[in-house]
């Protein structure tokens, strides 16, 4: 018979970080850099572990060039062709600052695998692979991870998405280094409404991080961050990386053209399982499928650098409030308190800084 779990599961909106005594005199003293050695690839990562999503409107080459200046990572979306990858590498002249902060995304079809192998063989500096499916619980996905690990034994593999500890363990033991955590929390994802499936993001991160770290693996919180405070909460919950999409949407570096409506500028932003994405890349929505994503006009925000400064400033502030001198200490210092109200929104909810 159906089973109900009565233990409360929490999202970012359900908690706040409790402030604690601190020896820090300034936010400038906070060190946001992390260094990880991955379980399966044995490679070392150094950077600020905030990751641009591999959505085609966010995970662009242009985004990667800017984010790399801040030591942030970009998972390049899977719809770039081999020639476009070649042109990008030539343009940046294999800049190690950029190449060390990007990964190639791939689906799990035969053609996806062939393109992945071609690009990785062509660009030896490319050391990160992101294997991305909506449902990371499928046996075919686990088999694909094993196949990619066998083909690329020294590449670092991100894989997901899942939301429970036992599946995190399965993916890590199958060859993944970093497991992406999150089903349905994204700002333009409608999976929870269409399928009724999901898991509150903070609880998913807490439980999956515990499972992963027990195997010397890593987790990436993917989705659900509506402001810099949510990013801090994800790190506080044990995430090693935090992937963001909506917070980076609408900028110059995003895919698509700027459009004008009623005198205001916008950029199109949509989920990768939306009607828009499926029609763009597959010609139509298959009869057996339903759209599981929204398409919205995102207010134009100008250059992404301004938003990155705001995001990193919020992270430093969170660390300062709870007495963490380094981002590494955030999860150790974090205590969450349950709340019924986050903020006083009498005038406006949080908005990412943008250029009107």
UniProtKB/Swiss-Prot annotation:
GO MF, one example: metal ion binding
Active site residues according to the UniProt entry: 189, 191
Enzyme Commission code(s) on record: 1.7.1.7
Reaction(s) the record says it catalyses: IMP + NH4(+) + NADP(+) = GMP + NADPH + 2 H(+)
One of the protein's GO biological processes: purine nucleotide metabolic process
InterPro entries noted in UniProt: Aldolase_TIM, GMP_reductase, GMPR, IMP_DH/GMP_Rdtase_CS, IMP_DH_GMPRt
SMART domains: IMPDH
A GO cellular-component term linked to this record: GMP reductase complex
NADP in keyword set: yes
Classification via SUPFAM superfamilies: Inosine monophosphate dehydrogenase (IMPDH)
Residues binding GMP, per UniProt: 222-224, 245-246, 271-273, 289-293
CDD domains: IMPDH
Residues holding K(+): 184, 186, 189, 192
Domain of life (superkingdom): Eukaryota
Record keywords, A-Z: Metal-binding, NADP, Oxidoreductase, Potassium, Purine metabolism
Function: Catalyzes the irreversible NADPH-dependent deamination of GMP to IMP. It functions in the conversion of nucleobase, nucleoside and nucleotide derivatives of G to A nucleotides, and in maintaining the intracellular balance of A and G nucleotides.
Family label: Belongs to the IMPDH/GMPR family.
Record-given protein name: GMP reductase
Organism: Ascaris suum
Higher taxonomy: Eukaryota, Metazoa, Ecdysozoa, Nematoda, Chromadorea
